Amino acid sequence: MYNNNQNHHNNDNNMNKDEPTTIYPEFISISNEIKTNGSTNSYLNNIRREMLSMVNSGNNNNNNNNNNNNNNNNNNNNNNNNNDSIVINMDTINNNNNSNNIDINKSGYSQISNTTSNDNLNKTLLGNNEISQINDIDDDSSPEFIKYKKFISSLSYITFIGAAIVLINQKKSVYIQFHAYQSFYISMGVIGFQFLLIWSDILSIILWSLYLLFTIFMFLKVSFGGYGNSTIYKLPIIGNLSEQKAKLRSQEYSRYFKYHEDLFIKELREHKQALIHQSNLNRNNNNSNNVNNNGHQRINSNSSSVVMSGDVESMLNSSGSNSSIYSDVQNDIGTNEE
């Protein structure tokens, strides 16, 4: 498990070398925040990679448009750029820990909305998410996250108030929820016995003394002890009930979480499609504008040539008339001399 998480961190480091910084700065800030606060969460990593791929695709579209504009300004139109493609790198966490590359053709907006391609994309993004696979009380986590989980679990033994706060804020980890449920049930049991033993001060003191020793023991063991099934310290009856409740609650939360993950990634994909579609429209508009400009230039050149030819003809006609006038004057002079 440590090697797998190390591979994910290496993939993040490799991705950071090519992260764009010139477009969608809000996505970059969100991506950096996700990297800082949730690098061990598979869902957050998927969202971060999806946003980075969308930003990369937007930069590629802008570069292609700039290249097309430069070529059009130099009257070197090249229509072969219509078949360019965007490569979306989606490194999702699956059983084989592989990366999948999906080519999306930019030449048609309708091609992206194909049902088969959408199904494959959904399977790639959401098919093998580790939060929906909870088989043991010691759920999978990275080594650097174990200390945090142990600390939160130990806080749940600070009376039923600490357990309730942990249950409200921690819904994914089975390990944390197990200790919170176990502490909550023990606290409620002690409070219930206190009402039954309220008539005896000695029994009440013994009861609360045992509860205090139990909470101190569990706090120290969970905080500084080992991590795993062998160091869970599960009580015979309450422990089994706590384990079942923790697994059931985590599974319900994972389904709810996965549903919102589907919606969020769907919105990202739709926004990416809109970017590609807008890029195609801009490129087509640029091409049509360049064609119109070239047509106007040809018309202007033809009109100027016509004007020039008309000027030449008028000049020739005027010179001819002048020569005829000159000949008439010469004839008049000759007749006068005779």
Curated annotation (Swiss-Prot):
Stretches with biased composition (Basic and acidic residues): 9-20
Ranges annotated as biased composition (Polar residues): 328-338
Domain of life: Eukaryota
Location relative to the cell: Membrane
Cellular component GO terms held in the UniProt record: membrane
Alphabetized UniProt keyword annotations: Glycoprotein, Membrane, Transmembrane, Transmembrane helix
Glycosylation sites: 37, 83, 97, 105, 114, 122, 229, 240, 286, 302, 317, 322
Name used for this protein in its record: Putative uncharacterized protein DDB_G0292342
TM spans (from-to): 148-168, 178-198, 202-222
Region annotated Disordered, chain positions: 1-20, 55-92, 279-303, 316-338
Composition bias, Low complexity: 59-92, 280-294, 316-327
Cystine bridges: none
Membrane topology: Multi-pass membrane protein
Main location: membrane
